[in-house]
Amino acid sequence: MPQVETDDATLYVEVDGTGEPVTVVAHGLTNNRNELAAFTPFVSGTHVRFDFRGHGRSSAPETGFAFVDFARDLDAVATAYGATRAIGTSLGAGAIASLLARAPDRFERTVWLMPAGLDGPFPFKDRYDAMAAELEGKTAEEALEAILFAPERAAEYLRMPWKREVDRLLWDHDHPDGVARAVRGVIRDWPVPDREMLRGVTSPVLLICVEGDEIHPAELGRILHGLMPASHLLVYPSEGSLFAGLPELVQRVNAFLLGDDEAADDLG
Protein backbone atom coordinates (compact mmCIF):
# COMPACT_ATOMS: atom_id res chain seq x y z
CA MET A 1 0.00 0.00 0.00
CA PRO A 2 1.69 3.26 -1.11
CA GLN A 3 2.24 5.60 1.82
CA VAL A 4 4.20 8.72 2.64
CA GLU A 5 5.39 9.14 6.22
CA THR A 6 5.68 12.57 7.85
CA ASP A 7 6.71 13.44 11.39
CA ASP A 8 3.15 13.01 12.64
CA ALA A 9 1.05 11.32 9.95
CA THR A 10 0.95 8.42 7.51
CA LEU A 11 -0.54 9.55 4.20
CA TYR A 12 -2.25 7.10 1.84
CA VAL A 13 -1.38 7.60 -1.83
CA GLU A 14 -2.69 6.33 -5.18
CA VAL A 15 -0.91 6.97 -8.47
CA ASP A 16 -2.23 6.80 -12.01
CA GLY A 17 -0.81 7.81 -15.36
CA THR A 18 2.83 7.79 -16.44
CA GLY A 19 5.55 10.18 -17.45
CA GLU A 20 5.82 13.94 -17.15
CA PRO A 21 4.58 16.19 -15.77
CA VAL A 22 4.03 14.78 -12.29
CA THR A 23 1.03 16.43 -10.62
CA VAL A 24 0.02 16.09 -6.98
CA VAL A 25 -3.76 16.25 -6.45
CA ALA A 26 -5.10 17.59 -3.14
CA HIS A 27 -8.77 17.09 -2.21
CA GLY A 28 -11.25 19.23 -0.30
CA LEU A 29 -12.28 19.14 3.36
CA THR A 30 -14.23 15.94 4.28
CA ASN A 31 -13.43 14.40 0.88
CA ASN A 32 -10.63 12.03 -0.10
CA ARG A 33 -8.33 10.99 -2.93
CA ASN A 34 -11.31 9.87 -5.04
CA GLU A 35 -12.54 13.44 -5.52
CA LEU A 36 -10.95 14.03 -8.94
CA ALA A 37 -10.13 10.40 -9.80
CA ALA A 38 -12.66 10.34 -12.66
CA PHE A 39 -10.86 13.21 -14.39
CA THR A 40 -7.14 12.58 -13.87
CA PRO A 41 -6.97 9.89 -16.61
CA PHE A 42 -7.73 12.68 -19.10
CA VAL A 43 -4.78 14.77 -17.89
CA SER A 44 -1.29 14.10 -19.25
CA GLY A 45 1.50 12.70 -17.13
CA THR A 46 1.53 11.11 -13.68
CA HIS A 47 -1.10 12.00 -11.09
CA VAL A 48 -0.45 11.50 -7.39
CA ARG A 49 -3.72 11.50 -5.44
CA PHE A 50 -3.53 11.28 -1.67
CA ASP A 51 -5.63 11.53 1.48
CA PHE A 52 -4.89 14.43 3.80
CA ARG A 53 -4.36 13.63 7.49
CA GLY A 54 -7.61 12.61 9.15
CA HIS A 55 -9.19 11.75 5.80
CA GLY A 56 -9.67 8.59 3.76
CA ARG A 57 -7.12 5.91 4.61
CA SER A 58 -4.53 8.27 6.09
CA SER A 59 -3.82 8.33 9.80
CA ALA A 60 -5.54 10.77 12.14
CA PRO A 61 -3.17 12.39 14.64
CA GLU A 62 -4.67 13.88 17.79
CA THR A 63 -3.40 17.36 16.87
CA GLY A 64 -2.02 19.20 13.87
CA PHE A 65 -4.96 20.28 11.69
CA ALA A 66 -4.01 23.85 10.76
CA PHE A 67 -3.40 24.88 7.15
CA VAL A 68 0.37 24.69 7.68
CA ASP A 69 -0.10 21.02 8.62
CA PHE A 70 -2.09 20.26 5.47
CA ALA A 71 0.55 22.17 3.51
CA ARG A 72 3.18 19.87 5.06
CA ASP A 73 1.18 16.87 3.86
CA LEU A 74 1.03 18.30 0.35
CA ASP A 75 4.74 19.10 0.32
CA ALA A 76 5.69 15.66 1.66
CA VAL A 77 3.73 13.81 -1.03
CA ALA A 78 4.94 16.14 -3.79
CA THR A 79 8.55 15.67 -2.68
CA ALA A 80 8.23 11.89 -2.45
CA TYR A 81 7.01 11.65 -6.05
CA GLY A 82 8.85 14.58 -7.61
CA ALA A 83 5.71 16.56 -8.45
CA THR A 84 6.25 19.87 -10.24
CA ARG A 85 2.53 20.68 -10.58
CA ALA A 86 -0.30 20.73 -8.06
CA ILE A 87 -4.09 20.73 -8.26
CA GLY A 88 -6.11 21.53 -5.14
CA THR A 89 -9.82 21.74 -4.42
CA SER A 90 -11.05 23.97 -1.57
CA LEU A 91 -8.94 22.73 1.37
CA GLY A 92 -6.42 21.51 -1.20
CA ALA A 93 -6.28 24.98 -2.74
CA GLY A 94 -5.78 26.42 0.74
CA ALA A 95 -2.90 24.02 1.35
CA ILE A 96 -1.30 25.13 -1.92
CA ALA A 97 -1.72 28.78 -0.88
CA SER A 98 -0.19 28.08 2.53
CA LEU A 99 2.79 26.32 0.97
CA LEU A 100 3.38 28.91 -1.77
CA ALA A 101 3.15 31.79 0.71
CA ARG A 102 6.28 30.37 2.35
CA ALA A 103 7.90 28.82 -0.75
CA PRO A 104 6.64 30.74 -3.82
CA ASP A 105 8.68 28.66 -6.27
CA ARG A 106 7.65 25.25 -4.89
CA PHE A 107 5.64 24.30 -8.01
CA GLU A 108 6.02 25.26 -11.65
CA ARG A 109 2.24 25.45 -12.15
CA THR A 110 -0.79 25.12 -9.88
CA VAL A 111 -4.55 24.84 -10.30
CA TRP A 112 -6.80 26.16 -7.51
CA LEU A 113 -10.32 24.77 -7.85
CA MET A 114 -12.96 26.47 -5.70
CA PRO A 115 -10.69 28.22 -3.18
CA ALA A 116 -12.52 28.86 0.10
CA GLY A 117 -10.25 30.97 2.30
CA LEU A 118 -7.45 33.50 2.37
CA ASP A 119 -6.43 35.45 5.49
CA GLY A 120 -9.64 36.06 7.41
CA PRO A 121 -12.05 34.13 9.66
CA PHE A 122 -14.34 31.50 8.17
CA PRO A 123 -17.94 32.79 8.30
CA PHE A 124 -19.80 29.47 8.65
CA LYS A 125 -18.23 27.98 11.79
CA ASP A 126 -21.53 26.93 13.40
CA ARG A 127 -22.59 24.90 10.37
CA TYR A 128 -19.28 23.04 10.23
CA ASP A 129 -19.04 22.57 13.99
CA ALA A 130 -22.40 20.80 13.77
CA MET A 131 -21.04 18.56 11.02
CA ALA A 132 -18.00 17.71 13.14
CA ALA A 133 -20.21 16.87 16.11
CA GLU A 134 -22.29 14.57 13.90
CA LEU A 135 -19.18 12.63 12.85
CA GLU A 136 -17.50 12.42 16.24
CA GLY A 137 -17.63 9.06 18.00
CA LYS A 138 -19.04 7.18 15.01
CA THR A 139 -17.57 4.19 13.25
CA ALA A 140 -16.74 4.56 9.57
CA GLU A 141 -19.98 2.79 8.63
CA GLU A 142 -22.09 4.90 11.00
CA ALA A 143 -20.56 8.13 9.73
CA LEU A 144 -21.22 7.20 6.10
CA GLU A 145 -24.82 6.29 6.89
CA ALA A 146 -25.33 9.59 8.73
CA ILE A 147 -24.16 11.51 5.67
CA LEU A 148 -26.05 9.52 3.03
CA PHE A 149 -29.33 9.65 4.93
CA ALA A 150 -29.09 13.20 6.26
CA PRO A 151 -32.49 14.94 5.71
CA GLU A 152 -30.86 17.98 4.14
CA ARG A 153 -29.39 15.80 1.38
CA ALA A 154 -32.67 14.14 0.37
CA ALA A 155 -33.76 16.87 -2.03
CA GLU A 156 -30.32 17.00 -3.63
CA TYR A 157 -30.34 13.25 -4.21
CA LEU A 158 -33.79 13.49 -5.82
CA ARG A 159 -32.50 16.12 -8.25
CA MET A 160 -29.21 14.33 -8.87
CA PRO A 161 -29.49 10.61 -8.00
CA TRP A 162 -25.88 10.05 -9.07
CA LYS A 163 -24.73 12.34 -6.25
CA ARG A 164 -25.44 9.66 -3.63
CA GLU A 165 -22.86 7.31 -5.14
CA VAL A 166 -20.36 10.16 -5.45
CA ASP A 167 -20.84 10.95 -1.76
CA ARG A 168 -20.43 7.27 -0.92
CA LEU A 169 -16.97 7.39 -2.53
CA LEU A 170 -15.96 10.76 -1.10
CA TRP A 171 -17.11 10.06 2.45
CA ASP A 172 -15.11 6.83 2.71
CA HIS A 173 -13.00 7.55 5.80
CA ASP A 174 -11.28 5.13 8.18
CA HIS A 175 -11.28 7.68 11.01
CA PRO A 176 -14.43 9.85 11.29
CA ASP A 177 -13.00 11.40 14.46
CA GLY A 178 -10.04 12.52 12.37
CA VAL A 179 -12.35 14.19 9.87
CA ALA A 180 -14.07 15.97 12.77
CA ARG A 181 -10.70 17.21 14.05
CA ALA A 182 -9.81 18.39 10.55
CA VAL A 183 -13.08 20.29 10.21
CA ARG A 184 -12.63 22.02 13.55
CA GLY A 185 -9.02 22.89 12.79
CA VAL A 186 -9.65 24.33 9.35
CA ILE A 187 -12.61 26.54 10.26
CA ARG A 188 -10.57 28.15 13.04
CA ASP A 189 -7.60 28.89 10.79
CA TRP A 190 -6.91 30.49 7.42
CA PRO A 191 -4.50 29.58 4.61
CA VAL A 192 -2.10 32.54 4.81
CA PRO A 193 -1.34 35.05 7.58
CA ASP A 194 -1.27 37.95 5.10
CA ARG A 195 -2.61 37.93 1.55
CA GLU A 196 0.24 40.18 0.42
CA MET A 197 2.57 37.18 0.75
CA LEU A 198 0.96 35.71 -2.38
CA ARG A 199 2.29 38.56 -4.53
CA GLY A 200 5.56 36.64 -4.49
CA VAL A 201 3.96 33.75 -6.40
CA THR A 202 5.15 34.40 -9.96
CA SER A 203 4.57 30.92 -11.38
CA PRO A 204 1.41 30.39 -13.47
CA VAL A 205 -1.75 29.76 -11.42
CA LEU A 206 -5.17 28.76 -12.75
CA LEU A 207 -8.08 29.80 -10.50
CA ILE A 208 -11.48 28.17 -11.07
CA CYS A 209 -14.59 29.55 -9.33
CA VAL A 210 -18.39 29.53 -9.56
CA GLU A 211 -20.72 32.48 -9.01
CA GLY A 212 -23.17 32.10 -6.14
CA ASP A 213 -21.16 29.62 -4.05
CA GLU A 214 -21.12 31.02 -0.51
CA ILE A 215 -18.44 28.63 0.74
CA HIS A 216 -16.18 29.17 -2.27
CA PRO A 217 -17.02 32.74 -3.34
CA ALA A 218 -16.07 33.84 -6.83
CA GLU A 219 -15.02 37.18 -5.35
CA LEU A 220 -12.20 35.37 -3.56
CA GLY A 221 -10.99 34.15 -6.93
CA ARG A 222 -10.96 37.73 -8.18
CA ILE A 223 -8.95 38.83 -5.15
CA LEU A 224 -6.43 36.03 -5.66
CA HIS A 225 -6.22 36.89 -9.35
CA GLY A 226 -5.31 40.45 -8.41
CA LEU A 227 -2.60 39.27 -6.03
CA MET A 228 -0.71 36.76 -8.18
CA PRO A 229 0.78 38.32 -11.32
CA ALA A 230 0.82 35.16 -13.46
CA SER A 231 -2.64 33.94 -12.47
CA HIS A 232 -5.58 33.19 -14.75
CA LEU A 233 -9.20 33.21 -13.62
CA LEU A 234 -12.09 31.10 -14.89
CA VAL A 235 -15.47 32.03 -13.38
CA TYR A 236 -18.52 29.93 -14.23
CA PRO A 237 -21.95 31.58 -13.85
CA SER A 238 -23.44 28.60 -11.97
CA GLU A 239 -22.69 25.11 -10.68
CA GLY A 240 -24.75 23.75 -13.58
CA SER A 241 -22.59 25.54 -16.13
CA LEU A 242 -19.48 24.14 -14.47
CA PHE A 243 -20.82 20.57 -14.69
CA ALA A 244 -21.92 21.11 -18.28
CA GLY A 245 -18.50 22.49 -19.17
CA LEU A 246 -16.44 19.78 -17.44
CA PRO A 247 -15.10 18.15 -20.65
CA GLU A 248 -13.82 21.51 -21.89
CA LEU A 249 -12.50 22.43 -18.44
CA VAL A 250 -10.50 19.20 -18.18
CA GLN A 251 -8.97 19.98 -21.58
CA ARG A 252 -8.10 23.49 -20.41
CA VAL A 253 -6.50 22.21 -17.21
CA ASN A 254 -4.50 19.62 -19.16
CA ALA A 255 -3.21 22.22 -21.62
CA PHE A 256 -2.40 24.64 -18.80
CA LEU A 257 -0.40 22.03 -16.88
CA LEU A 258 1.52 21.28 -20.08
CA GLY A 259 2.50 24.95 -20.38
CA ASP A 260 -0.22 26.51 -22.55
CA ASP A 261 -1.28 29.71 -20.79
CA GLU A 262 -3.71 30.60 -23.58
CA ALA A 263 -5.84 27.62 -22.51
CA ALA A 264 -6.56 29.54 -19.31
CA ASP A 265 -8.00 32.67 -20.93
CA ASP A 266 -10.40 34.31 -18.50
CA LEU A 267 -14.10 33.48 -18.48
CA GLY A 268 -14.85 36.19 -15.92
What are the functions of these language-model segments?
Residues 122, 138-184, 188, 197:
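Conserved alpha/beta-hydrolase catalytic His-Asp/Glu region
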Residues 97, 101-137:
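Flexible "cap/lid" loop of the alpha/beta hydrolase fold
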Residues 88-96:
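Gly/Ala-rich beta-loop-alpha elbow adjacent to hydrolase catalytic centers
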Residues 214-220:
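Conserved alpha/beta-hydrolase "acid-adjacent" motif
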Residues 49-87, 251:
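Active-site loop/oxyanion-hole signature of alpha/beta-hydrolase fold enzymes
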Residues 7-59:
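Conserved HGGG/HGGXW glycine-rich cap/lid loop of the alpha/beta-hydrolase fold
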